[in-house]
Amino acid sequence: MKKIGLLFMLCLAALFTIGFPAQQADAAEAPYKASITNISTDGGVYGKINYGQGQYWRVKYNITVSGKLLDQNGQPVPNAPVRFEADTKVGNTTQTASGTTDANGTFEVPMYLGPAAGYYTYYTSVSVHYYDIIPFRVFSGESRLVSTDNSLYHFAYQVRR
């Protein structure tokens, strides 16, 4: 009987220590919404693409995030702080960049991501692409915002066939 009780306690302890991934900010709690209109990058990998895990921006080392901050009524939010975070695979680091919206609520924030590891592969007729899928978060002040984009394809390299 003691073994069953001990086993139950261990299972219960394991149940409460399991971690869950961070989720999108709750729209009811977030003061603003970040509408990302463009993410430009270096390395000739510009634009959104679908490698099979969803339609995400494909980026390399350096990016510039452009968009607009909107309040809950869809109106632009002028002169507000905006911060971006991305968790990269090389070194398991969180990269951050900050900026401020202009008088029209728009932002354009440069951000350094560094190199990607290339844990995922995508095969084309002429090459193989190696990339990571990294979480991408947006904040204003300490509040996590609802965003149009929450993940990025962090491009590592390609091998021509």
Curated annotation (Swiss-Prot):
Coiled coil: none
Swiss-Prot/TrEMBL keywords: Secreted, Signal
Domain of life: Bacteria
A single Gene Ontology CC term: extracellular region
Signal peptide: 1-27
InterPro entries, A to Z: CarboxyPept-like_regulatory (IPR008969), Ig-like_fold (IPR013783)
Stimuli inducing this protein: Transcriptionally regulated by SigD.
Compartments it resides in: Secreted
Protein name as catalogued: Uncharacterized protein YlqB
